[in-house]
Amino acid sequence: MALIRKRRAAPQDIYPACKVSNTCPADILNKMEQNTLADKILKYGSAGVFLGGLGISTGKGVGGRTGYIPLGGTESGVGVGTRVTTIRPTVPISSVGSPDFIPVDAVDPLGPAVIPPERFPIAVEDPFTLPPPRFPTAVEEDVIELQPIPGPSSEIPLAGPKITTDAQPAILEVIPETRPPKVITRHQYSNPAFEVSITSNSGAGESSASDHVLVEGFSGGHSIGEHIPLQDLAPSRPSFSETIEDETAFSSSTPKQGSRSERPKSYYNRRRYQQVQVTDPVFISRPRSLVTFDNPAFDESVDLIFERDVAEITAAPHADFTDITKLTKPAYHRGPSGHVRVSRLGHRANIKTRSGLTIGPQSHFYYDVSSIDPAESFELQALGNVSSAEQTGEAVISSGTGDFEIISLEDSILESYNDEDLIDVFEDVARDLHLLVGERRQQPIQVQRYIKPFSFVNEGVHIIHPGSESDFWLPPVTPDSTPAIVIDILDSSADYYLHPSLIKKRKRKHFFF
């Protein structure tokens, strides 16, 4: 069996990756680091042989220092020398001109040799005086005897400074310093479409501000300045009419003139996708209900994937969505009719191979949203007789159902009721109230709510005949004024005692003191 040699990547691609991990092959490492046999020969051979003047491997193609010489001929007599640098004169710092000279009078050869002092006056100098010391000190006077020096006597002439006086003031010739003139330029460009401020104090240099000069006159009736009428710079520009036109032909807030409806072109490829128009509006809100049963835990904005076995024969709720395993998220665009179209791509799985792979065609499902019709306008009518209400002050509300009864407040047929029937019935609301008396720190007294009835003597029905005397004694009909419950309010201990009839019957007897 012949072995196939696989091609390896370029050395410049292998070297950066293998250098980090130190796993580079020897040939790639030597080639990239210039350590091959040829590189070693050039390194060691260049140490003993100098080939610098021949221009080998320089890549310039000039033939070394001497250049190329044609075969069978001689070198040209004209040689290219070095480039001569041209020296330009420098700009003088100051202007060059004739200096200022002091005029000098010509000397008369026949005149006197001694120049009179009036021609050139001499300044008068003050005699030299020694100033007093700043800090005077006390000096003791000593007498010093001067003795002549033995020998021949000699006289020392005394010479002082020559003083010349003149009554005229001194004249000094002062030569003014000459400086070269300076030129200061200022450029200013005005932009009529941009104003920075009313006044501009910009210095030298370019500026977009313009100076405005305001001239005010105090004599009334005079117009200062010039009136320049403005003209249209673009007379060919079309004029706009001031009338307002109501345009309702467009269906969007920012209509585009002459623009075609943008829709995905790949969806309408009939050779690739089957075009299926859906008429059920559930396709927009709940597309899953067209394929399988509803599941509330899903999101319509993502792709819908339906897991089903191809071998199982399951009918879809909608015939067009049979064998659909996936529906993409909705795409909104404009249809040919101008309505909004909602599109989804569906993948069918109606073919299953032996390897278990399910394949099938793809379909383009689209639904055109219908236009919204304008709302119907209903004319509102006034309720009741408006004219009669304005005149008589009554308003009658009538209903067509007949469930209401019309009642006139001015009709005297209404029955009159007595005042006694209108009086409220008195209700005894304080019948079962109990009075609880006690101090703040003591617990309230709980009294039994229901009083146990007690029997009178010879209770029953008795017939009394008038004018006859009864043989037996009858108790008085007037009830006893003794209360059943006696509460002593003045006693701080809040003690009480019950009526003997309220005491439960026991074997043990109670004694009251």
UniProtKB/Swiss-Prot annotation:
Protein function: Minor protein of the capsid that localizes along the inner surface of the virion, within the central cavities beneath the L1 pentamers. Plays a role in capsid stabilization through interaction with the major capsid protein L1. Once the virion enters the host cell, L2 escorts the genomic DNA into the nucleus by promoting escape from the endosomal compartments and traffic through the host Golgi network.
Family stated for the protein in its record: Belongs to the papillomaviridae L2 protein family.
Protein species of origin: Canine oral papillomavirus (strain Y62)
GO cellular component: host cell; host cell endosome; host cell Golgi apparatus; host cell nucleus; viral capsid
Region annotation (Disordered) ranges: 229-269
InterPro entries on file: Late_L2
GN (gene name): L2
Subcellular location: Virion; Host nucleus; Host early endosome; Host Golgi apparatus
Post-translational events: Highly phosphorylated.
A single MF term (Gene Ontology): DNA binding
Top-level lineage group: Viruses
Cysteine pairings via disulfide bonds: 18-24
Pfam families: Late_protein_L2
Protein name: Minor capsid protein L2
UniProt short sequence motif Nuclear localization signal, positions renumbered to this chain: 1-9, 504-509
Biased composition (Polar residues): 249-258
Gene Ontology BP terms: microtubule-dependent intracellular transport of viral material towards nucleus; symbiont entry into host cell; viral penetration into host nucleus
Disulfide bond found in the keyword field: yes
Keywords (A to Z) from UniProt: Capsid protein, Cytoplasmic inwards viral transport, Disulfide bond, DNA-binding, Host endosome, Host Golgi apparatus, Host nucleus, Host-virus interaction, Late protein, Microtubular inwards viral transport, Phosphoprotein, Viral penetration into host nucleus, Virion, Virus entry into host cell
Summary of subunit composition and partner proteins: Interacts with major capsid protein L1. Interacts with E2; this interaction inhibits E2 transcriptional activity but not the DNA replication function E2. Interacts with host GADD45GIP1. Interacts with host HSPA8; this interaction is required for L2 nuclear translocation. Interacts with host importins KPNB2 and KPNB3. Forms a complex with importin alpha2-beta1 heterodimers via interaction with the importin alpha2 adapter. Interacts with host DYNLT1; this interaction is essential for virus intracellular transport during entry.
Keyword DNA-binding attached: yes
